[in-house]
Amino acid sequence: MEQYYGEIAGIATAFCWTATSMFFEAAGKRIGSLSVNLIRLLMAFFLLGTVNWLYRGLFLPLDASVHNWLWLALSGLVGFTIGDLLLFQAFVVVGARVSMLIMALSPPMAAISGWIILGETLEYSAILGMVITLTGIMMVVLNRPVKTKNGKKTKLKDWFNNPLGLLLAFGGATGQAIGLVLSKKGMEGYDVVASTHIRVMAGFIGFVIVFFFMKRWHKVFIALKNKQAMKGVTIGAFFGPFLGVSFSLLAVQHTLTGIASTLMALVPVLIIPPAVIFFKEKINVMEIIGAVIAFVGVGLFFL
């Protein structure tokens, strides 16, 4: 079992991100996604600092080397600030379905980046597992119920006629892939929670700069007064940038980046049960088939 720590951590990351996506979606509808991003990172900063202080005696990762700080901070800026900004804007321009479909490119991009930056190479069985898993994920995304506009169904092909939206989604996928690879390069055996802390700090500073340029601070202050939204952000921050990102770094620390990224991409599949149970959504046969295919691909990583 020890040899699969990375793969297990990758799956744990996907479960955490499934939970956080539901809470952040609800909060984002109330206070906006940009405010959610800034506040969640601030909350994660204090959560991570508290954990670091309890078991390492340091609230801030002051024992990190210059190498750790440089690459992990860069990872936080690329992954959290740039990647998330582009992805959330893509949600607005072309919708969540097309954005998540483009985001399925993140694992192969992470594998390629891992090969270029870290010299990682995937075995044929791992490549096959990645292809099968991502095929299943894309089947699930493509077959999710389409939201209607003015009583008419929006065709998927119509959403692909927006090159700006596609570029934004592709930029988000690239940011997340490269951010993950940079985090692995930056850790080099350093503590996972402390590494996550550095990434979160860099991401938070990046968003602070963005808010200054966009002059959106008044919306943050309004958001902080929304008790219902703050509950969602708090729970989402716990499962997302606190637990989820920590698990993601644990994953890349113990397995290849491409494999870890593929397992983390299971969110569209894992969200099916809560969507049915809590939101009473209907699923179709193709979604079920896609989910089964995805898990068959995951199984190949454990052979």
Residue ranges and their predicted role:
Residues 43-47, 102-116, 131, 202-206, ...:
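Alpha-helical transmembrane segments of compact multi-pass small-molecule transporters, enriched
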Residues 75, 120-136, 191-203:
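Alpha-helical transmembrane segments
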Residues 18, 49, 77-81, 107-112, ...:
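Hydrophobic/small/kink-forming positions within alpha-helical transmembrane segments
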Residues 12, 39-40, 102-105, 124-128, ...:
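Hydrophobic core positions of alpha-helical segments in small-molecule transporters
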Residues 34-35, 97, 123, 193-194, ...:
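Residues that define the loop-to-transmembrane-helix transition and helix capping
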Residues 158-188, 193:
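Selected transmembrane alpha-helices and immediately adjacent juxtamembrane segments
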Residues 62, 66, 103, 110, ...:
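Loop-to-transmembrane alpha-helix entry segments
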Residues 1-16, 21-35, 39-74, 84-94, ...:
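Membrane-interface interhelical linkers
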